[in-house]
A protein has these predicted regions:
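Conserved phosphate- and dinucleotide-binding cores of soluble alpha/beta proteins
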Residues: 1-132
């Protein structure tokens, strides 16, 4: 699962950590066998160049997320910047999550590996439920 389109993935993980259950609700367009979407990575502003270099070494292509309604980059509620990182098909999301977490200056990334207790996908035929 990749989250962070709204740049709140760090906060979402804090909420998950304090909740008894983490349930994801999505539409069918979000379902995929292999993750191949950009991974948001929240970084400390001063660490951005180093984090970008390390992401590149991991095979990613980091891009600083620009704000849509103001000049400059997106700044999260906690003051982090967001790098949108393209990795292509992510065959081992757990390994990539661990590698990203190990980079100094990374506040949090949008890979939610083995965190959801249940996933509800709404379809035209009803709801598909996957429990962990």
């Amino acid at each position: 699962l990749v989250k962070g389109g709204g740049a709140a993935h760090a906060r979402e993980k804090y909420v998950d950590a304090s909740a008894d259950r983490f349930v994801v609700v999505a539409d069918p367009s979000k379902a995929a066998e292999v993750l191949d979407v950009s991974v948001p990575v929240a970084v400390l502003p001063d660490a951005r160049p180093v984090v970008a270099e390390r992401v590149t070494e991991l095979g990613g292509e980091p891009t600083l997320r620009d704000a849509e309604r103001k000049d400059g980059p997106v700044v999260t509620d906690d003051g982090s910047l967001v790098l949108d990182c393209e990795f292509g098909a992510i065959e081992a999301p757990g390994d990539l999550a661990a590698d990203l977490s190990a980079i100094p200056g990374v506040v949090e990334h949008g890979l939610f590996v083995d965190l959801a207790d249940a996933v509800y996908v709404g379809t035209s035929d009803g709801v598909q439920v996957t429990e962990r």
